[in-house]
Amino acid sequence: MRVRFLKFICIFCFSFALVGLEAQEKKSPETLKIQEKEISVSTKSAEQPTEEKKEDTYIKEEELKPTSNQKKDPVVFGFLVDGYYNASLNRPDSKELQYTTQATRTNEYNINLAYVDAKVETDKYRGRLALQFGTSVVANYGGEGTTGKTSNETSIRNMQEAYGGFRLGKSTWLDAGIYFGHLGYESWISHENFVYTRAFSLDYVPYYVSGVRLSGKITEKLSYQLHLNNGYQVVTDNNKDISGGFRLEWNPTGNLMFRWNTFAGNEQPTATPKEMRYYNNFIAEWKPFEHLTLASSFDVGYQERASREDLVYTDNGPLYVRRDSNAFRQIYVGNIWFAYRFLPEWRIGTRLERYLDREQMIIVTNSKDGFQTGGATATLDYIPDPAVLVRFTYQYRRSMDSIYPHEAHTSKLDRMFIFSLSIKI
């Protein structure tokens, strides 16, 4: 009996355990669902502040982003400071160089050019205002004339450019005011050139003009400029005549450029007989590789003689010589440039030049053979940043006559070392 009773108790307990296990298995899915709901609710409650913060941050970022209705400021401001030390081997007593506008003060540190500017360019209008200072400014504007009380000659020397323009067509613009001249290969701003100083041909063509300019494209590879100006590098006109010229630029390929610039106008004051000047400037530039540039220019100029009597200079002094006809005076100029950036931060630039103005049409030396000069210039550039340019320049020039200041006298040679540092933003 006891054995049967014990068996009954064991079977009952085992059956009860199985029933309890089945009941637990049936209830576990519901329990898990409830637990999942509780976990999800708690997770949402915990994550809700983070999502709100993300949404607030997103809204703030969207507010900071410019919308299509907001216009960007079209005005861009910039400046340049170009300082130099000219160690002239001629060591002129006056410390002043002649026949150049660049680095004119010798054996002292000075500012060649400094300017601040504001530029604007949109689809419909454009313009630039730049105020400038420096020794090159004083030298370059020395010939600016005075024709009246309000002729503005005292203030324009500090005005590098002041012009405005608007679009006439798809690629046609009309500008008016004071702006850079169109003759020559090198820029007025040395920071943009391969060589620190300027070629003679660039120092004696207009860096600036005052007038009206029409520019545009004839084809995708051919562009033009038409100019009406007060004169040859003058803002204040010295006569009643209008001067002008044009530019044609052809880019047959992406690395080849040809340019033809012209000028025509009377350069004599109203009180003197008219002498028309005609100037042609031809330029070719080739960039066979990304860091290599080869360029050349050839200039030819003619100017009428006012009379058959021509002033010439002899060993015995100046005298007038009667000509058979009032033929034109002539000048011929040639330049070659080579620039190679052999390392990311280093570049070498060289220039060869020849200037022939025997009859002193543009450059007056008061010497027998006039201005017949040639030379070579080399500049080594260190470019630690696109805005910074450290330059080491050597320049050698030789003239047929003794015209260059040399201590208390003159010399046929002009040699100098120039160190310069410029920052352009």
Where are these regions (language model features)?
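Bacterial N-terminal signal peptides
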Residues: 9-17
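N-terminal periplasmic/intermembrane-space "pro-region" immediately following the signal or transit peptide
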Residues: 21-92
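Outer-membrane beta-barrel channels and translocator barrels
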Residues: 72, 121-125, 169-171, 181, ...
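Residues on the lipid-exposed face of transmembrane beta-strands in outer-membrane beta-barrel proteins
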Residues: 79, 107, 111-120, 161-166, ...
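Transmembrane beta-barrel strands of outer-membrane/channel proteins
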Residues: 79-87, 129-133, 176-178, 226-230, ...
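Surface-exposed coil loops of outer-membrane beta-barrel proteins
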Residues: 88-108, 137-161, 168-250, 259-266, ...
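Outer-membrane beta-barrel pore domains
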Residues: 100-103, 140, 147-155, 256-262, ...
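Glycine- and aromatic-enriched membrane insertion/assembly motifs of diderm outer-membrane
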Residues: 103-136
